[in-house]
């Protein structure tokens, strides 16, 4: 690696580790496809302006496209400069970038300079930062990885979150990974998800040489664990949490029912929140109907509806324990035990939540 490349790599690492505020000059349509943590979309051009300039570039070349770009943004450029300057004033350490760190970045920085505001340009722009974070994830797949397994409700995600070297792939995906994994808010875009995981890995690497990750399928809701990282996970040693059924039931009842009721009510208000919560549980159960079989699904659905009615009338979530116990017994536990048997040679330790946490604290650094 050349000295200049190494310096840029160190710069990118520093920008992310210091949580440097970033002005993303790309058009909104570009930003929506994926962005970085700490970035704010303050575009030089609107989507329509960008499209016109792109068409002009293809037909008439760069010079004509630049001229058209100046003409298109002229009427609103003072407003855009004001927004950039305000962001820089509120975030003195801010940098800016466009897609490649080229013309859009230089023009915007010059506009700011003409108004007495200096700002640094990220060399290589979004494309270089994105490539850097992809490399971070790829390199992480070669690190020492430890996978945390266990039946549904064992608190694997809670365990990951409690560890200094835990990489929370479900939390960053905003999905718990199961049929009941959907959250109140939407999942991020795949690119944004990968970017955030990479930044998390950078932070962990400051104090640890290993990563502890939850045993997960490749898909987490509508998102996917990055390919190289997932490949590393399938080879890594494991620990397995074996919490008693009663503890698991109470934990799942809290997560599926108590917590989700609160989240939906907070986001949507009491009436709409309740309707969304009902739909969340109904859709979750419907999502595993084929695995349960028609008859079991009908029985469990009846139990679920009774539990919802009881909760609405009394506020008690106790009735939900019945159908949750059934899906553990008839679906989740048999499925996970089957999967775990195929990974038995990778298991290094088994124990309760607390025992596994203590083992990981001592044996993974």
UniProtKB/Swiss-Prot annotation:
Keywords, alphabetical: Selenium, Transferase
Domain of life, per lineage: Bacteria
* Reactions the enzyme catalyzes: 5-methylaminomethyl-2-thiouridine(34) in tRNA + selenophosphate + (2E)-geranyl diphosphate + H2O + H(+) = 5-methylaminomethyl-2-selenouridine(34) in tRNA + (2E)-thiogeraniol + phosphate + diphosphate; 5-methylaminomethyl-2-thiouridine(34) in tRNA + (2E)-geranyl diphosphate = 5-methylaminomethyl-S-(2E)-geranyl-thiouridine(34) in tRNA + diphosphate; 5-methylaminomethyl-S-(2E)-geranyl-thiouridine(34) in tRNA + selenophosphate + H(+) = 5-methylaminomethyl-2-(Se-phospho)selenouridine(34) in tRNA + (2E)-thiogeraniol; 5-methylaminomethyl-2-(Se-phospho)selenouridine(34) in tRNA + H2O = 5-methylaminomethyl-2-selenouridine(34) in tRNA + phosphate
Asked if the record carries the keyword Transport, the reply is no
Active-site annotation: 98
Q: Where is the Rhodanese domain?
A: 16-138
Listed NCBIfam families: PRK11784.1-2, PRK11784.1-3, tRNA_sel_U_synt
Q: What assembly does the database describe for this protein?
A: Monomer.
The name under which this protein is listed is tRNA 2-selenouridine synthase
Q: Which organism is it from?
A: Psychromonas ingrahamii (strain DSM 17664 / CCUG 51855 / 37)
From which lineage does this chain's organism come? Answer: Bacteria, Pseudomonadati, Pseudomonadota, Gammaproteobacteria, Alteromonadales
Gene name, Swiss-Prot/TrEMBL: selU
């Amino acid at each position: 690696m050349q000295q200049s490349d190494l310096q840029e790599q160190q710069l990118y690492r520093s920008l992310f580790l210091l949580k440097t505020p970033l002005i993303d000059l790309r058009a909104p349509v570009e930003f929506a496809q994926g962005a970085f943590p700490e970035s704010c979309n303050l575009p030089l051009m609107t989507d329509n302006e960008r499209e016109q300039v792109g068409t002009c570039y293809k037909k008439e070349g760069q010079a004509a496209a630049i001229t058209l770009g100046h003409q298109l943004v002229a009427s609103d450029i003072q407003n855009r400069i004001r927004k950039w300057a305000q962001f820089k004033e509120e975030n003195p350490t801010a940098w800016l970038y466009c897609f490649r760190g080229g013309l859009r970045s230089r023009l915007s920085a010059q506009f700011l300079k003409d108004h007495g505001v200096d700002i640094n340009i990220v060399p290589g722009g979004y494309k270089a930062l994105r490539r850097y974070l992809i490399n971070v994830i790829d390199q992480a797949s070669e690190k020492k990885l430890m996978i945390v397994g266990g039946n549904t409700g064992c608190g694997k995600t809670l365990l990951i979150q409690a560890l200094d070297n835990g990489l929370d792939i479900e939390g960053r995906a905003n999905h718990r990974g199961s049929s009941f994994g959907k959250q109140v808010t939407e999942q991020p875009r795949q690119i944004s998800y990968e970017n955030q995981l990479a930044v998390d890995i950078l932070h962990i690497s400051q104090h640890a040489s290993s990563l502890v990750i939850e045993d997960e399928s490749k898909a987490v809701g509508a998102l996917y664990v990055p390919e190289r990282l997932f490949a590393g996970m399938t080879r890594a040693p494991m620990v397995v949490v074996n919490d008693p059924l009663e503890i698991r039931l109470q934990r799942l009842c809290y997560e599926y029912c108590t917590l989700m009721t609160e989240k939906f009510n907070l986001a949507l208000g009491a009436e709409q929140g309740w309707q969304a919560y009902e739909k969340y549980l109904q859709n979750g159960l419907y999502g595993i109907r084929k695995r349960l079989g028609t008859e079991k699904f009908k029985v469990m659905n009846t139990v679920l509806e009774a539990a919802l009615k009881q909760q609405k009338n009394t506020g008690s979530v106790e009735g939900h324990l019945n159908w949750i116990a059934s899906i553990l017994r008839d679906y989740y536990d048999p499925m996970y035990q089957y999967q775990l048997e195929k990974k038995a040679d990778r298991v290094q330790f088994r124990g309760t939540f607390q025992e596994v946490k203590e083992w990981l604290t001592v044996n993974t650094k």
